[in-house]
From Swiss-Prot:
Gene3D superfamilies, sorted: Ribosomal protein l15e
Basic residues bias spans: 166-175
UniProt-recorded name of the protein: Large ribosomal subunit protein eL15
Disordered as annotated region, ranges: 164-194
GO biological process: cytoplasmic translation
One cellular component term from this protein's GO annotations in UniProt: cytosolic large ribosomal subunit
Top-rank taxon, per record: Archaea
Molecular function as annotated in GO: RNA binding; structural constituent of ribosome
UniProt keywords, alphabetically: Ribonucleoprotein, Ribosomal protein
Amino acid sequence: MKSMYAYIREAWKRPYEGYVGELMWHRLQKWRREPAVVRIPRPTRLDRARALGYKAKKGIIVVRVRIRRGGRRATRPNKGRKSKGLMVNRRTPKKNLQWIAEERANRKYPNMEVLNSYWVGEDGRYKWFEVILVDRDHPAIKSDPQLSWVSRTRGRVYRGLTSAGRKARGLRRKGRGAEKVRPSLRANFRKKRR
């Protein structure tokens, strides 16, 4: 017999079909009108949130972040050059959008630490992620055996230690083809320059 979470997971495998698709259509209309970073009372994808460490207890909050898709936009230079050299639209960041969303959530709530995040929707212009944040100084977190380690860390997301950050840094790979990702890309670049 399947658990409730198995049914939720199955429904979210095709988020634009069936009843989840209908919900998504209404949700996206509402989310577009909201601010870029919004605290929400409970996770949209309960199965995913719980798998990533969410618990319905004091000291843990969920924030939905809207982020614009595509590469970074730069301010248009006002001095002369070839139009090819403007580089307004073709600035590809070395971070994935999920990592950027986590950083923005943490900037809004600086007293908290990013535990993890997951995708909840996208359209032609935006992507939405839900970020799980933990209050590192809350007594309920300090006394929780699974989450007490968070109270001993600071600025995980800015150091690329979340799952999305580790992925962008190439740390999902090991062995052949991943020689240059450890200890870090910067360390290997500096070593090469010596």
